[in-house]
């Protein structure tokens, strides 16, 4: 999957009101940081009240990602989520806690659900075992991106994936991510994080179609 990452196009602060985004944008909304990025097509991202957002996409969009969360993130946050994840098993999509750090430059995902493609299959990656958090098992894989887009321009960097097994289903979903458990396990495998940049609970789609309406807290 081609992974984003948000490029600053416009940064605004919003009051309690719905706003539909058609173009790449980052900012703050009702106490939450948000990011919306796409590389093409008609995907839209709707800012709702509080930590709620909605995403709607079709196959006209090659790759998109959007979500709400925090900037900067941290290593000890417990993230709660609920709502509707409207894809099917044939759609290439992730529902995940997603973020970046610098020094080292790391892109990380805690994948709660996904469609047709699991990041555990990333080419050239290394399996880093599994652990239990919140009553669920997460399999961990480190992947490598070379000369790829990042939050500091085109770079080469590692990606860390914790993938929930079994994954959450489609339709109505809810759960929580104790991020500290992931950070501690990654560190035990020699996978450190750096200084946190943004950290969002995101929906991502790649050459697929779907709808998501998610509330983050």
Swiss-Prot record:
Glycans are attached at residues 56, 80. GO terms for molecular function: endo-1,4-beta-xylanase activity. Its main location: secreted. One of its GO terms (biological process) is digestion. Residues 1-17 form the signal peptide. It catalyses: Endohydrolysis of (1->4)-beta-D-xylosidic linkages in xylans. Its EC number is 3.2.1.8. Pathway: Glycan degradation; xylan degradation. The keyword Metal-binding does not apply. The lineage of its organism: Eukaryota, Metazoa, Ecdysozoa, Arthropoda, Hexapoda. InterPro entries: ConA-like_dom_sf, GH11/12, GH11_AS_1, GH11_AS_2, GH11_dom, Glyco_hydro_11. Residues 20-217 form the GH11 domain. One of its GO terms (cellular component) is extracellular region. Belongs to the glycosyl hydrolase 11 (cellulase G) family. Gene3D superfamilies: 2.60.120.180. Expressed in larval carcasses and gut, and adult gut. It is found in: Secreted. It comes from the Eukaryota. Keywords: Carbohydrate metabolism, Digestion, Glycoprotein, Glycosidase, Hydrolase, Polysaccharide degradation, Secreted, Signal, Xylan degradation. This is Endo-1,4-beta-xylanase. The active site is at 107 (nucleophile), 204 (proton donor). The keyword Flavoprotein does not apply.
């Amino acid at each position: 999957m081609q992974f984003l990452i948000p490029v600053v196009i416009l940064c605004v602060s919003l009051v309690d009101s719905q706003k539909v985004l058609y173009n790449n944008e980052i900012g703050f909304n009702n106490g939450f940081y948000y990011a919306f990025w796409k590389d093409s097509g008609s995907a839209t991202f709707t800012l709702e009240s509080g930590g709620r957002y909605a995403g709607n996409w079709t196959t006209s969009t090659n790759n998109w990602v959007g979500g709400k969360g925090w900037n900067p993130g941290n290593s000890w946050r417990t993230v709660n989520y609920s709502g509707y994840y409207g894809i099917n098993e044939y759609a290439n999509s992730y529902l995940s806690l997603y973020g970046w750090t610098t020094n080292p430059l790391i892109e990380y995902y805690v994948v709660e659900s996904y469609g047709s493609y699991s990041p555990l299959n990333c080419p050239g990656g290394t399996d880093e075992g599994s652990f239990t958090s919140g009553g669920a098992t997460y399999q961990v894989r480190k992947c490598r991106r070379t000369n790829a887009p990042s939050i500091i321009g085109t770079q080469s960097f590692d990606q860390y994936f914790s993938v929930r097994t079994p994954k959450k289903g489609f339709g109505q979903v809810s759960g929580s991510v104790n991020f500290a458990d992931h950070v501690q396990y990654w560190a035990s495998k020699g996978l450190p994080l750096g200084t946190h940049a943004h950290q969002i609970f995101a929906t991502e789609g790649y050459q697929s179609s779907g709808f998501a309406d998610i509330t983050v807290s």
